Structure formats: structure tokens, C-alpha cells
Amino acid sequence: MDFITGFFGSLNFEVIFQLTFVSLILISGPVVIFLLAIRGGDM
């Protein structure tokens, strides 16, 4: 049990959330461009 609490205590959740949101933003850009190309340019 000490291993689990120590593991979650040592994780920096702010850094994890920031990296998650940055990766979502980086992925969403090409996805929007790809969808626009498929639909012929009109949303």
C-alpha cells in the first residue's frame, strides 16, 4: 500500500495534464485539416 501512495504522491499531475492538453491541441490541428480536405473545404 505504501508503494501505491508513494507512486501517486511522486507523480506531478499538473505536468501530466499540461502534456495531455498540448498533445490534444497538436493532434486536433491536422485532424481538422484532414476533415476539411475530405468534405471539400466546407464545414
Curated annotation (Swiss-Prot):
What is a single cellular component term in the Gene Ontology annotation?
A: plasma membrane-derived thylakoid membrane
The keyword Thylakoid is annotated on this UniProt entry: yes
Which of UniProt's keywords are assigned here?
Membrane, Photosynthesis, Photosystem II, Thylakoid, Transmembrane, Transmembrane helix
Segments spanning the bilayer are: 15-35
Q: How does the entry describe its membrane topology? A: Single-pass membrane protein
Question: Its principal location?
Answer: membrane
Cellular localisation:
Cellular thylakoid membrane
Can you supply a Gene Ontology BP term from the record? photosynthesis
What InterPro entries does this protein's entry cite?
A: PSII_Ycf12_core-subunit (IPR010284)
Protein purpose: A core subunit of photosystem II (PSII), probably helps stabilize the reaction center.
Q: How does it assemble?
A: PSII is composed of 1 copy each of membrane proteins PsbA, PsbB, PsbC, PsbD, PsbE, PsbF, PsbH, PsbI, PsbJ, PsbK, PsbL, PsbM, PsbT, PsbX, PsbY, PsbZ, Psb30/Ycf12, peripheral proteins PsbO, CyanoQ (PsbQ), PsbU, PsbV and a large number of cofactors. It forms dimeric complexes.
Q: Which HAMAP family match?
A: PSII_Psb30_Ycf12
Q: Which family does it belong to?
A: Belongs to the Psb30/Ycf12 family.
- In Swiss-Prot or TrEMBL terms, this protein is called Photosystem II reaction center protein Psb30
Query: Which organism does this sequence originate in?
Result: Picosynechococcus sp. (strain ATCC 27264 / PCC 7002 / PR-6) (Agmenellum quadruplicatum)
